[in-house]
UniProtKB/Swiss-Prot annotation:
Enzyme category, top tier: transferase
Nucleotide-binding recorded as keyword: yes
Alphabetized InterPro entries for the sequence: Kinase-pyrophosphorylase, PSRP
Protein family: Belongs to the pyruvate, phosphate/water dikinase regulatory protein family. PSRP subfamily.
Name of this protein: Phosphoenolpyruvate synthase regulatory protein
Binding locations of ADP: G157, V158, S159, R160, C161, G162, K163, T164
Length: 277
């Protein structure tokens, strides 16, 4: 493996820059380098584009290394200014559009903000996503057991195993109505599936975690407590995993997975439709 090299990476767009970030991060993850990321959204006029160019040039002058620039910009006059910079510039969308244009024998009609902006064609989808987020927040950590039948998935697990961030990611990224229910220390003496969840067993998904990792996470929250002790964590994890087995609840060990990976595995295992926004 080559030596690790620091590089400055720009993600530039005339919109939110989310597309530039996602594709740029995917590309950069293939290289063993430490990067310093700079995201610049809404570069929509020439004066802002020139300021961005100056920022790129300044880093080049300071480091002697060309910054990497991933951009997605519709207006050619704005693109031209960025291309005059000292950065190594890559039009991430055009790299995919050009071969598709040839294959489909059809010219694209690029419009700024089409991917993540609001327009009459996607308002219903946007409203559905906001409703999913509201639902998920209202049903976080067992706050409310009302309307659980409206959930598309109900995550179960001990405290600090990743239920809340995964639920929110499912709602925000995919518009999934995700509730979650915690099993706490007081439940462990006689752990059973709550009556309110039994009719919804087809929507239940369990999260578990290595006790050592759980103890480390809890220690940051409540140092030197029984709650964070390895013995307590081992007991809780063992009890919850036994409950999953007894009730045939699909489950996943979240220890070595990111929130994005956990959410994607849940969608796959539960057969939930992915909806991109």
């Amino acid at each position: 493996m080559d030596n690790v090299v620091d590089r400055h990476v720009f993600y530039i767009s005339d919109g939110t820059a989310i597309t530039a970030e996602v594709l740029g991060h995917a590309v950069m993850s293939q290289f063993p380098v430490t990067i310093s990321s700079i995201t610049l959204p809404f570069v929509e006029n020439e004066s802002r584009a020139r300021a961005v160019k100056d920022q790129i040039d300044a880093i080049y002058q300071q480091t002697g290394v060309r910054p990497l620039v991933f951009y997605s910009i519709v207006l050619p006059e704005i693109r031209a200014i960025i291309l005059q910079s000292e950065g190594f510039c890559q039009d991430i969308v055009q790299a995919l559009v050009a071969p598709l244009q040839q294959e489909m024998k059809q010219d694209p009609t690029p419009i700024a903000h089409r991917t993540h902006g609001l327009n009459p064609g996607n308002l219903n989808k946007y409203d559905a996503r906001i409703a999913a987020i509201d639902y998920t927040l209202a049903h976080d950590d067992g706050i409310s057991l009302r309307n659980l039948d409206q959930a598309q998935v109900i995550l179960l697990g001990v405290s600090r195993c990743g239920k809340t961030p995964t639920s929110l990611y499912l709602a925000m990224q995919f518009g999934i109505r995700a509730a979650n229910y915690p099993f706490i220390a007081d439940d462990m003496d006689n752990l059973t599936l709550p009556t309110s969840l039994k009719p919804l067993q087809h929507k239940l998904f369990g999260l578990t975690i290595d006790p050592e990792r759980l103890a480390a996470i809890r220690e940051e929250r409540r140092e030197n407590s029984r709650y964070a002790s390895l013995r307590q964590c081992r007991m809780e994890v063992a009890e919850v995993e036994a409950l999953y087995r007894k009730n045939q609840i699909p489950c996943l060990n979240s220890t070595n997975y990111s929130v994005e990976e956990i959410a994607t595995k849940i969608l796959d295992i539960m057969g939930l439709n992915r909806r991109m926004y």
